[in-house]
């Protein structure tokens, strides 16, 4: 299955860590790690919060599902 989110890439581009993101969102670091490895996906509200923290559009956090 194709990775749905680009969270790990955006964290690197923004020079932030998954621990930082977990603290900002009040989430467990394991949860954020699962998002970064695409084992789990954040809900739309959380994606919107993440986009706001990074100053990007939600679509910048997602990979296209088109082939």
Question: What does each model-found stretch correspond to?
Answer:
Residues 27-42:
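Recognition helix of helix-turn-helix/homeodomain-like DNA-binding domains
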Residues 21-22:
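Short alpha-helical "recognition helix" segments of helix-turn-helix
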Residues 45-60:
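DNA major-groove recognition helix of helix-turn-helix/homeodomain DNA-binding modules
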Residues 38, 49, 67:
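Alpha-helical DNA-recognition elements
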Residues 36, 54, 62-65:
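DNA major-groove recognition helix of helix-turn-helix
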Residues 1-17:
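A short, Lys/Arg-rich alpha-helix, primarily the initiator
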Residues 18, 29, 44-47:
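Helix-turn-helix DNA-binding elements, focusing on the entry/boundary residues of the two helices
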């Amino acid at each position: 299955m194709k990775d749905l989110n680009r969270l790990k890439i955006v964290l690197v581009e923004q020079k932030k860590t998954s621990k930082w993101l977990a603290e900002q969102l009040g989430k467990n670091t394991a949860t954020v790690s699962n998002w970064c490895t695409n084992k789990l996906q954040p809900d739309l509200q959380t994606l919107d919060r993440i986009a706001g923290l990074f100053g990007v559009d939600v679509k910048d956090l997602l990979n296209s599902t088109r082939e």
